[in-house]
Amino acid sequence: RVVIPKEIRRTMRIREGDPLEIFTDNDGEVVFKKYSPVGELSPFAAQYADVLSRACGMTVLVCDRDRVVAAAGNCRKDFLERRISGALEDLMDKRQTHVAQPGGQNRLQPVEAVERYAAVAAPILANGDMTGAVCMVQPETGAVPSDGDIKLAQVAAAFLGKQLEE
């Protein structure tokens, strides 16, 4: 059994039950690395995000529980490898789909330090576990997503979840 101090758990956002890789380096130091199942699908997720972005005309993000692992669309470089926001983490913990409303009353900023908001955010579930989310970033015009956009995000999340199960 390995006990990780609370300060390190907070800084690295390590939650109870999070998978960790534990190994030693050449100097004999013990190294803990967070394991991301969604990160394993990164090249595949990037292709899926690209196709989805072209279909809906929005920037699309695929996130694990900590960061954006794949992005496609106009602003992809602004989002890639960035840490997700606490609001998106909370939404994922609730296993709910977020849909932007007209007038922007329920804004969700998916990524820290980027002032853009999600049109749709759908959780990725694999074997009943929360593993990440698919987000469509609202266009600058602030247009609300169509029913088709919402379904596309939900289907993408379900498909990526199934890929993780196999």
Please state what every model-predicted region is.
Residues 6, 35, 102-103, 124:
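Fold-independent oxyanion-binding glycine-rich loops
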Residues 30, 122, 134:
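A broad, low-specificity signal marking well-ordered, structured residues that form hydrophobic/aromatic
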Residues 49-113:
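Structured interaction and signal-relay segments at domain junctions
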Residues 71, 132-133:
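Short glycine-/small-residue motifs
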Residues 118-125:
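A short, aliphatic-rich beta-strand micro-motif
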